[in-house]
Amino acid sequence: MKKTAVLNAQLSGVIASLGHTDGLTICDAGLPIPSEQQCVDLALTKGVPSFLSTLEVVLTELFVERILLAEEIKQANPTIEQQLLEMINKLAQTQGRQIEIEYVVHSEFKQRSNQAKAVVRTGECSPYANVILYSGVPF
């Protein structure tokens, strides 16, 4: 059995397959996901697993260069945004590099999410609880 944080075989494989600048979307239960896009659907029921708990585990195994958020999270879900930014700042310290943070309107976020290598769907049911993590390199 694996000793690292990600036990889900499909999610572990997706993370391992990411190359430099590849995108990985972690999203709430409502974000549209194209049928042809690779999706790791972790959603069990409303709120399980949560967006933040899923993000926390993924960040233990992924070197992140930049992230993308929907601008609307600032007004519609400031608590999630604040906790997410705290996690990203902590990760930047651990990685020894700044992580670029970009905001776009939600319609553009959805278009960019469609270009991500994969999407991880959570059971989160709060507005705009979505992020695209762009893979970096640790060297």
Swiss-Prot record:
Organismal lineage: Bacteria, Pseudomonadati, Pseudomonadota, Gammaproteobacteria, Pasteurellales
Domain of life of the organism encoding this protein: Bacteria
GO cellular component, one term: cytosol
Gene3D superfamilies: RbsD-like domain
SUPFAM superfamilies: RbsD-like
Binding-site residues, substrate: D28, H106, Y128, A129, N130
Subcellular location: Cytoplasm
Keyword terms: Carbohydrate metabolism, Cytoplasm, Isomerase
Job of this protein: Catalyzes the interconversion of beta-pyran and beta-furan forms of D-ribose.
Reaction(s) catalysed by this chain's protein: beta-D-ribopyranose = beta-D-ribofuranose
Assembly and oligomerization: Homodecamer.
Name of the gene encoding the protein in the UniProt record: rbsD
Pathway(s) the chain acts in: Carbohydrate metabolism; D-ribose degradation; D-ribose 5-phosphate from beta-D-ribopyranose: step 1/2
A GO BP entry: D-ribose catabolic process
Stated name of the protein: D-ribose pyranase
GO MF assignments: D-ribose pyranase activity; intramolecular lyase activity; monosaccharide binding
E.C. designation(s): 5.4.99.62
Family stated for the protein in its record: Belongs to the RbsD / FucU family. RbsD subfamily.
Catalytic residues as annotated in Swiss-Prot or TrEMBL: H20
